[in-house]
């Protein structure tokens, strides 16, 4: 990950993360990884048969990329834009993907997939989402001796980046718990005598299929004030007057959305 910075003062600055290169392990045969732990952030592992076998934890996660922009003329007239994005990892095998961990398998905002069987075996299996966010803020103020106006607008929005486990057969085998949150487990039938399309999930304790709550908010404040002149005639006379008025408008909305989990098979689903 590299970060590009431009800073010409608080009202003229930008910072953005980007991925310069992605770590990759690839083979046309079997890709076999063995060790104490396996951790990936925006990495890629592929092969015909991909096997990761560790004593403790497998973590297939994402890399956080941030952006922050602010520009304007002064503290009353400017715009701010901030965002957070997630770049996930990938573990794939054309014929199969086998993940074995002595403790936990954690897949977060990433993909594990094969045209054949995908099998995860561990104490706990966690297939989870990541969150992305976007924040905007606008300030505008103008006026003169006779009138003034101001505007302040803010918004915030979250979105889910779910994990996906996909294969012709998907097997999840946990001694304790299986947790699936705002993510997808998909089994698609292939060709041949045993096309698959089955999901088999077994746990010693609980299988939890959960949703993720996402926050969003919006606020807008407008104010204006100023002098105005009024003219009237009647009864053979003519009158003129000056009045002063103020107006304000304030809107606020806060809400939540829900990102759900999906288990979809073209064959059988056994929990």
Q: Residue locations for each model-derived region?
A:
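Binding/recognition "hotspot" determinant
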Residues: 1-270
